[in-house]
């Protein structure tokens, strides 16, 4: 709260207070800018300053969680801090600190001493680009990133119908793939909990980096031209970014990971899939045959999606648009369940055949319901192809229809219609395009999560 209210910045999610000391950036809420955050160990030649974060390791009084405080004032050889969960009585009127900690200056270093004798102060964190005396970001040990293969004992667990075909979603999956999760259902892979946390940390940080790169692209025509997006859409793209930067529901980052580290190579920002496989089918597989320790990291995925929809600006009725592809049936149904859990009314549209226009030229479905909010399984690229089919030189605006003699509705007539709120927003085509990778590398050279990439 202190960082947000006083500086308009926040840090990414962490499980425990002591983990804050491993972070190296803050996010500026108003524009998603990434600001450098440096960590200085207790005893550092870099003095603590008012407004800095003070971090304790887990242990003693702060068992398991560690502790975090704000340095509010340097007062002689004392540092005054504000914190929670230590002082449980009201502070004197006008007092803006909870405790005073002794600061010892010796041998060119600054050391803070806690009032508890069983705790360890890790150090302080300052938002600055100056890295002198700062600690490097901790790196996870390579062996903890190893993906390990294992086998279940074959007792015929998957010989029969182990997926419940009476359940519409599971049945849709079976219709597309059969009672199959992979070529050998007895072979599976595991990662360590440390690797899972590293993936979470990397995803959060990279998402902000992709947003930063997207902003740079949309401000530079020369960069935007590299993305092969019809020029007639450029004003729409920029408007989408300005108005709907925080309207994204879901995306999927693809990583390569082994003992050498973790690298991102694609961000499916405008058309993520695999929700059903991760959030349902893998759960059913585990219930059917897995007896070991651990858990499926995606077991709460549908609740997370429902939460994202609850906090979205989607309209009360959402049409779910999918292609006439059997695999997309279960993808659409999984998202429909998330939407319904979030309290939305829904209808799945398979293809575009039932869409048309009413007498006023408004887009309607086969039941006559107005179509004004959609979530799509399609990527944006098929809509771009439709625009490329007609020369954009012939039009001063995107050539969408408000009627047609044969009542034929194209994808662009839905997704690019001004009154239709589409998810994912149009701007997501920028982070979803591989042309973003060289721009990321130019902005964050030698970043540990990036591959060295350039335009050839």
Model-assigned labels for residue ranges:
Residues 1-25:
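N-terminal capping segments
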Residues 18-88:
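...with weaker cross-activation on analogous glycine-rich loops/strands in unrelated enzymes
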Residues 11-13, 89-101, 448-454:
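Acidic Ser/Thr/Pro-rich low-complexity disordered segments
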Residues 132-456:
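Preference for protein termini
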Residues 54, 81, 103, 318-320:
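Hydrophobic beta-strand residues in large extracellular and virion-surface proteins
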């Amino acid at each position: 709260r202190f960082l947000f209210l006083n500086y308009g910045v926040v840090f990414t999610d962490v499980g425990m207070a002591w983990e804050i000391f491993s972070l190296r950036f803050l996010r500026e809420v108003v524009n998603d800018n990434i600001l450098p955050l440096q960590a200085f160990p207790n005893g550092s030649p870099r003095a603590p300053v008012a407004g800095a974060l003070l971090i304790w390791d887990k242990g003693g009084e702060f068992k398991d969680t560690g502790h975090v405080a704000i340095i509010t004032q340097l007062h002689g050889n004392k540092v005054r801090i504000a914190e929670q969960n230590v002082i449980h009585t009201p502070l004197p009127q006008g007092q803006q600190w909870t405790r005073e900690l002794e600061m010892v200056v010796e041998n060119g270093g600054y050391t803070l001493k806690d009032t508890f004798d069983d705790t360890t102060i890790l150090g302080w964190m300052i938002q600055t680009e100056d890295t002198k005396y700062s600690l490097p970001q901790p790196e996870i040990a390579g062996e903890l990133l190893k993906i390990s293969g294992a086998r279940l004992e074959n007792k015929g667990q998957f010989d029969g119908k182990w997926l419940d075909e009476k359940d519409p979603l599971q049945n849709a999956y079976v219709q597309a793939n059969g009672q199959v999760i992979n070529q050998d259902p007895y072979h599976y892979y595991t990662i360590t909990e440390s690797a899972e946390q590293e993936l979470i940390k990397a995803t959060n940080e990279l998402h902000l980096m992709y947003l930063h790169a997207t902003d740079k692209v949309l401000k530079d025509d020369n960069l935007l031209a590299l993305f092969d997006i019809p020029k007639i859409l450029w004003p729409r793209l920029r408007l989408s970014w300005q108005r709907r930067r925080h309207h994204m529901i879901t995306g999927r980052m693809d990583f390569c990971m082994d003992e050498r580290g973790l690298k991102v190579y694609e961000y499916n920002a405008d058309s993520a899939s695999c929700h059903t496989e991760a959030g349902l089918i893998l759960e059913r597989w585990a219930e059917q045959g897995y007896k070991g320790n651990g858990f499926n990291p995606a077991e709460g995925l549908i609740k997370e999606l429902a939460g994202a929809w609850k906090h979205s600006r989607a309209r009360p009725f959402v049409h779910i648009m999918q292609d006439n592809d059997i695999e997309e049936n279960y993808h659409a149904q999984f998202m429909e369940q998330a939407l319904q859990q979030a309290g939305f009314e829904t209808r799945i549209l398979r293809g575009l055949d039932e869409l048309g226009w009413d007498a006023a030229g408004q887009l309607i479905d086969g039941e006559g319901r107005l179509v004004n909010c959609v979530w799509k399984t399609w990527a944006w690229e098929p809509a771009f192809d439709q625009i490329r089919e007609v020369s954009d030189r012939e039009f001063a605006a995107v050539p969408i229809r408000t009627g047609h003699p044969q009542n034929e509705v194209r994808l662009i007539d839905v997704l690019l219609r001004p009154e239709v709120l589409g998810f994912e927003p149009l701007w997501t085509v920028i982070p979803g395009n591989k042309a973003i990778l060289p721009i990321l590398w130019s902005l964050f050279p030698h970043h540990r999560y990036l591959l060295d990439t350039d335009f050839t």
